[in-house]
Amino acid sequence: MKKLFLIFVAVSPRFTSFAQVNVLDASTIPATLKENAHSVKREEKIDFEVKDIDAARLSVHQVYTVLDAEGNDALDFFEYSTAFRKLEDAEIKVYDAHGKFINKYKLKEMLAEAFDQALVEDGKYYRFRVTAPAYPITVQYDYEVKYKGTLMYPDFDIAEPDQSVESSIYTATVPADIDLRYLSRNINLTPAISTQGKNKIYRWSVTNLPATEDEEGTAQDNSICPQVLIAPNKFSMDDNNGDLTSWKSFGLWYGSLARNANNLSDDTKKRLQTMVSGASNDKEKMKIIYNYLQRNFRYVSIQLGIGGFKPFDAAFVDQKKYGDCKALSNYMQACLSAVGITSYQALIRAEYNSEPVDPAFPKNWFDHVILCVPSNKDTIWLECTSNTTDFGVLGNFTENKKALLITNDGGVLVSTPKSTASENKFNSTTKIVLNDDASGESETDIKTTGEYKQELMHFVMNENKDDQQKYLVSRLGFLQPDELVFTKDLKNDSSEMAFKLAVEKVPEFTAGSKMFLSPRIYKIWSSRIPGDDKRKYDFYFPCPFIKTDTTIYQLPEDYTVENLPRPRDEKFEYGFYKTNYSYNESNNTITTIASLQLNQNVIPAEKYQYIRKFFGGVIEEYTEKIVIRKK
């Protein structure tokens, strides 16, 4: 068997030509590559050739065998095409478990979705999902991309989580006077380097690589999987040449793009100056203009780089009343400048669990733009794309990250602030009147700050009633209501919500004259913490937080308490959980109080077992029951 396998590896460069002799048969995959794998990368050949400082071409050939439904991500084709990165051709071939050809799809058969053409020239997404009638199934992708702009060299993404690799080769050809840099992560891999005329050729090769087991709750996949990051030394983008060997030089290049994009008409400047004329300090001026931006401008969600890096002129945004992240941040910067306030744009990699930027490897890690107003005492950070975020608050989308500040002297890598538990609060108070027939009517008041305020506004203020009800039941864990009535105008104070529920059955169950009630109507924590016995990577919560709940049961007149759960007071390194239960005989009410606090949202892998045990106890406590009975 070993000899057969060695022969197979030797001929793998001609892999696809042997489909007729069943080399694509899933049974030929070595058993070691099926362990912990839901898909296998059978063959991959990536050729990236830099023609000049502003031009390159990418050719990709990939063959995947998907072993089961959990590997279906490998059946998705997704590429974008713009004036800077044109998808010239693509083809998909599908084979069954035995390597028999099933179907073929061309680029014209794929779903094409256009970007906003005002923001992305010739911009389209191309998508295609291969349907698996059975498993295993093999899919082959072949596509060509032409680059007009060379800031973003394609990385060598060797494997996804739960994916093994039979053969993968990445070849990069680059003029020696431009050259490239590389950084291997989660794998010890160095390239073979050769020269051919004026070009340097880098060749990375991987064979028979076992799957990396996925771990829920990690940073994004690229941070745990084998990968080679690749970046140019010199590049051109948006018709501007740049140097990427340092953060300073990268910042100088980006700053040059926006240098002449801060134009506002005299009328607009006067309007802004009048708007802030009553403000007593710069912070008040910033807040007034930020609120103006939120009320009057719309964000178009386009990731930084897809439509280029040059922001649209502030005058364009002022007229159109919309823009992407770089356009709105540039506009806000121009508005602040019009009232005498200096600010700096900052490039950042967004999402609470995005892979951290490596300070030692200058590269375009970034996909978003925010704004920074520096101060010795009180630096203000502004998220210019949100219509709901409070002034000076970033939220978990961009907090606690490395950002590239674009100053007049070039780029400076800085850290954005991080929120504390006390800045992300969720407090609920519910009074429920329980009837003899086990039905009930409840009134709930919810108060939020920080990340929970943003969530509340997103799911409740801006959704229809069915979605609102789904949020209350599925996300917050309230009982399924027969009737839902909001008793507070959400738009008056978006940090609070009040509503009434009519519920046909309040108890978890009844037995004879007894009712068994949950400790509280709102599930203060219900998310499962995955069971990794030997965790390798840090675990990410969306944010640190404080959650409190008070539930008051008004019992039927002829009922009394038989049993209350014992109070809890659980503490661990990163937080605590406390509960208390009391019965007031004079008014026949049960009051339950719970408090849950998490002080840090990134938990080191070596501490994971403690947090899993802690939150497991929180969920377990909810299974305890309040027992009431007829007198």
Role assignments for model-derived ranges:
Residues 1-23:
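Bacterial Sec-dependent N-terminal signal peptides
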Residues 20-631:
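A sensor for short, sequence-defined functional sites
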